[in-house]
Amino acid sequence: MKKRLLTLVLMLLSLAGCAGQGNEDIPKTGAYTFEDDLGRTISVDKPERVAALTGSFADIWCLAGGEETLVAAAGDSWTSFDLSLSEHVVNLGAIKTPDMELLLAAAPDLVLVSSNTAAQLALLEPLEQAGLTVACFNVTNFSEYLRMLEICTGLTGDGEAY
């Protein structure tokens, strides 16, 4: 609950601090290109099916306007972040041991992975070998949070959410 409250406070602060600085010029269609926190260039069309391997990333994705496209999320999305996700969102289990079979069955076209979690980084190669686009983020402070939110709003095409 505290994490959810912190996320809400951070979001409110970002809205107040970024008034008039939204991503209004974000294209609604076509490929969106960005650099993830491993320094890799990622280029992806607007995702229609997204998996988030941490609850905080599921929260950011939903705040960025992607709630309808979230198809799989870590278990803490419901327990720690109390997100009201669709009944169709697959619970992947624990952050450090996401269920790969369920993840692959959800058929995401984008997977949001924490570069802070060794177990998730270990999934990077197998996920990419399975043909999935994987973006790694390291969100430990407010500026990193805003950076991920900006990228996610770019991906969803919802500049107003930033």
Name each region found by the language model.
Residues 4-5, 17-59, 159-162:
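Bacterial Sec-exported substrate-binding components of ABC uptake systems
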Residues 6, 62-65, 124-125:
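Short amphipathic alpha-helical segments
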Residues 10-17:
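Hydrophobic core
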Residues 29, 37, 45-48, 65, ...:
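Extracytoplasmic
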Residues 30-31, 41, 122-162:
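Extracytoplasmic substrate-binding proteins
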Residues 47-51, 69, 133:
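Residues that mark the start of a beta-strand
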Residues 52-106, 110-117:
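A short, structured surface patch at a secondary-structure boundary
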